[in-house]
Design a protein with these regions (language model features):
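Cofactor-/ligand-binding subdomain signature composed of acidic, glycine-rich
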Residues: 1-50
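Conserved phosphate/anionic-ligand binding catalytic regions in large, soluble enzymes, centered on
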Residues: 51-73, 172-184, 188-190, 343-355, ...
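Hydrophobic alpha-helical positions that pack around
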Residues: 136-262, 274
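Gly-rich Lys/Arg/Thr-decorated short loops/hinges at beta-loop-alpha junctions or inter-strand turns
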Residues: 25-32, 85-97, 200-206, 247-252
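Short amphipathic, charge-patterned alpha-helical segments
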Residues: 111-115, 261-279
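Intrinsic disorder at enzyme termini
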Residues: 1-18, 205-211, 215-217, 225, ...
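Ferredoxin-type iron-sulfur electron-transfer modules in oxidoreductases and energy-metabolism complexes
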Residues: 33-50, 79-81, 87, 96-101, ...
Length: 398
């Protein structure tokens, strides 16, 4: 049996020397899709329909169909519209978008241009996590190259089509990964989630219709437009088309980003990451980042890495951030660290989250220190139940 291998769609080849440059990207067909759209003035609905057929779903966590999300932009909306890339990757275990921006920034730019064209937006913003200084530098350099090559700006390729793109660095707040908190921060305000409705497609950045997508999602668009919807959907499995970048960390021998077909068995992904370190037994896995439920070893070893497969074992794909834990792991300590993260990162806008996350962390810390009581277990459930479903954003549910 052959060993599992990567299929790189959003990440460049391993042997690439300077993959972040325009010259390298053009050699691999980069901007061909954008130039074809500009030359032919492809109908916007055609691009959206192609993305719908491809089966591309949001790679940031929610898994919402990308083509459908783009179609929510009101066609009759007059005036300015925006496309926004959410590169505020801040959840524990996530680091895929960092490598896309570091090594393949032009594909994100082309993806934003195509998505912007599809919804009628002439301006885009990439909101990049503040701690990602090198990725931000790479993206800024790529923007300069694209402008100099006439791929961004006014009257592109002699047409009346315009598209300009800007980057904005975040300031370290995890909550700004929530799309409406991101918009608040982008506008220079305190990063706190907005009430919905109205949704961003109606009232978004600066009060204008806005569509927000994840970095990996937008980077997937150019290859789909270039190679066709059927090509992309044939890579993955039913209901989970294409490739997915899994950020594997924890107790493995080769942690890192692995871009593989959706639906790959977890045991194959674990093999690619070198297996559990020191030959120890697997205890549990967090398959999609700290906001998704933990899966025990026996269940995850029989699971496929896609939306449906992980749902069947009571968890979720999330952002594809796979945290592997071996038999030496104390699960109470894991819970303590995760609960502290959400306590520290609560924006404080909603009382159940602001107060409840603190209560959860303090009780778990007490249990971790050997000072807990049986009553604490009941209190934990009681507090958690009073947070869930009572907050503006999903942080409380996490």
């Amino acid at each position: 049996m052959s060993s599992p291998s990567e299929i790189r769609v959003c990440l460049p080849p391993h042997d690439a020397v300077t993959p972040w440059t325009l010259a390298f990207y053009r050699e691999r067909g980069g901007y061909d899709a954008w130039e074809k759209v500009l030359k032919n003035q492809t109908p916007r609905e055609e691009i959206i329909e192609t993305l719908k057929i491809s089966g591309l779903r949001g790679r940031g966590g929610a898994g919402f169909p990308t083509g459908l999300k783009l179609s929510f932009m009101p066609r009759d909306a007059q005036g300015q519209k925006y496309i926004v890339c959410n590169s505020d990757e801040s959840e524990p275990g996530t680091f895929k978008d960092r490598d896309i921006l570091r090594f393949n920034p032009h594909q994100v730019i082309e993806g934003m241009a195509l998505a912007g064209y599809a919804i009628g937006a002439t301006i885009g913003f990439n909101y990049i996590r503040g701690e990602y200084y090198e990725p931000w530098q790479r993206f800024e350099a790529a923007l300069i190259e694209a402008r100099q090559a006439g791929l961004l700006g006014e009257n592109l390729m002699g047409s009346e089509i315009a598209f300009e793109l800007h980057s904005q660095r975040g300031a370290g707040a995890y909550i700004c990964g929530e799309e409406t908190a991101l918009l608040e921060s982008l506008e220079g305000k305190k990063g706190q989630p907005r009430f919905k409705p109205p949704f961003p497609a109606q009232v978004g950045a600066f009060g204008k219709p806005t569509t927000i997508n994840n970095t990996e999602t937008l980077a997937s668009i150019p290859p789909i437009i270039r190679n066709g919807a059927e090509w992309f959907s044939s890579i993955g499995v039913e209901n989970s088309g294409g490739t997915k970048i899994y950020s594997v960390s924890g107790h493995v021998n080769r942690p890192g980003n692995y871009e593989v077909p959706m639906g790959m068995p977890f045991r194959d992904l674990l093999e690619m990451a070198g297996g559990v370190r020191d030959g120890r037994a697997l205890k549990a896995v967090i398959p999609g980042g700290s906001s998704v439920p933990v899966v025990p070893a026996d269940a995850i070893m029989e699971c496929t890495m896609d939306y449906d497969g992980l749902s069947q074992v009571g968890s979720a794909l999330g952002a594809g951030s796979v945290i592997v834990m071996d038999e030496t792991t104390c699960m109470v300590e894991v819970l303590e660290r995760i609960s502290y993260f959400y306590f520290a990162e609560s924006c404080g806008q909603c009382t159940p989250c602001r107060e409840g996350t603190g209560w959860l962390y303090r009780m778990i810390r007490r249990i971790r220190n050997g000072e807990g009581t049986h009553a604490d277990l009941d209190r934990l459930k009681s507090v958690a139940d009073r947070i869930e479903g009572r907050t503006i954003c999903a942080l409380g549910d996490a």
